[in-house]
Amino acid sequence: MFVPKKSKYKKVFKGRIKGNAKGGSTLSFGDYGLKAMEVGKVQSKHIETARRVISRTLKRSGKVWIRIFPDTPVSKKPADVRMGKGKGSIEFWVFKAKPGRVLFEISSDVPMHLARLALEKATAKLPMKCKFISNHN
């Protein structure tokens, strides 16, 4: 799973995700990509599941780039624990995706219809709306 090796702070505030993506909104490595259309917190398990769906659909052909990394910890207190007594322990890590951010890219040696199919299957595994983009428009 995707977990940072080290972090500047152990726990962070929840915060709000506002605005559109400033960087990472264009294709950099491949010719096909998956772009976020709305705000969402993508967990490391979502990224791994989507990656597996893409690689299985492509039958291990082509190259897949993961353009995001979960760097924000989410804490949770155990069940049946009273309020107070500090913040809970870290449960999982998330990437706070803004609209316009490219999440995955696929190389150009894969046919366009197969790349579209793979990325649309991966969209079903993510907690937000996404769209297929390509350099061949």
Swiss-Prot record:
GO terms for cellular component: cytosolic large ribosomal subunit. GO terms for molecular function: rRNA binding; structural constituent of ribosome; tRNA binding. Pfam families: Ribosomal_L16. Signal peptide: none annotated. InterPro entries: Ribosomal_uL16, Ribosomal_uL16_bact-type, Ribosomal_uL16_CS, Ribosomal_uL16_dom, Ribosomal_uL16_sf. CDD domains: Ribosomal_L16_L10e (cd01433). It comes from the Bacteria. GO terms for biological process: translation. Gene3D superfamilies: Ribosomal protein L10e/L16 (3.90.1170.10). Disulfide bonds: none annotated. PROSITE patterns: RIBOSOMAL_L16_1, RIBOSOMAL_L16_2. Keywords: Ribonucleoprotein, Ribosomal protein, RNA-binding, rRNA-binding, tRNA-binding. Part of the 50S ribosomal subunit. Binds 23S rRNA and is also seen to make contacts with the A and possibly P site tRNAs. PANTHER family: 50S/60S RIBOSOMAL PROTEIN L16 (PTHR12220), LARGE RIBOSOMAL SUBUNIT PROTEIN UL16M (PTHR12220:SF13). Belongs to the universal ribosomal protein uL16 family. This is Large ribosomal subunit protein uL16. It comes from Wolbachia pipientis subsp. Culex pipiens (strain wPip). The gene is rplP.
